[in-house]
């Protein structure tokens, strides 16, 4: 089965600093190499996301440069796109989607699924595709760092026809592709929309840490998936994914007795961190709780079709 092509511009993870450029020029002069080394880099909000430069007038691209060489720069200087958070955030103060003037023919209602590696994001996406595909016109985009593993899993398990599942290889920090530079994911979603005129779109991020969360420009509804295998302390650790996602899912609850995790503790801590934010406890592999997730998504989708500012 043919694997669909993906957008060719993955998001950047780093920018060169002036200090690095100076060091490179000095090294070139010392070794007598050609001093022409014209760099062209972009900020996360830039129109282009490839890191490129030329040697001897021969252009080439560096997909993801993330080499913090010793002595070249400090974390404050190197132009990294990571956000520094003052606090975990509050559910009631999260960014809300604004549908005013939204053209749904360009991109349908988009559900973003995030969470740490191995929490069950892809299994959830598979279950949602199976549950929605007969009633709704849907498509999906997956994100991996260097592979198409999740796309291939979904195709192999016949979640949707292969042409409705696109893959992004981020080449670096997964959160950059869903927040700092969303161009690759946005492009894939818009192409799916143009081809299939979908009613709902799904995008799954690569596995990341608790600080990762979606940009509202990309995801109309944000689901964050954690699981019990990391211990019952995870909800109280906070982070935007836990505190500010529209829906928090605690997955693999069937494993709780085997890993010594207390669901009561996780339920208590999730409520303390999220306030009125909904939390569902699931065992996606056993199809436990999936219907409740689907019901919440459908309610959010229906509410969005009235346009205007979404309610917290």
UniProtKB/Swiss-Prot annotation:
Annotated GO molecular function terms are:
GTP binding; GTPase activity; nickel cation binding
Q: Name one Pfam family in it.
A: cobW
State the CDD domains in the record.
Answer: UreG
Q: Where is this region: Disordered?
A: 28-86
UniProt motif (switch domain 2) ranges: 171-172
Origin: domain of life: Eukaryota
Subunit (UniProt): URE4, URE6 and URE7 may form a complex that acts as a GTP-hydrolysis-dependent molecular chaperone, activating the urease apoprotein URE1.
Specify the protein name: Urease accessory protein 7
Instruction: Please name the source species.
Output: Cryptococcus neoformans var. grubii serotype A (strain H99 / ATCC 208821 / CBS 10515 / FGSC 9487) (Filobasidiella neoformans var. grubii)
Q: What is the lineage of its organism?
A: Eukaryota, Fungi, Dikarya, Basidiomycota, Agaricomycotina
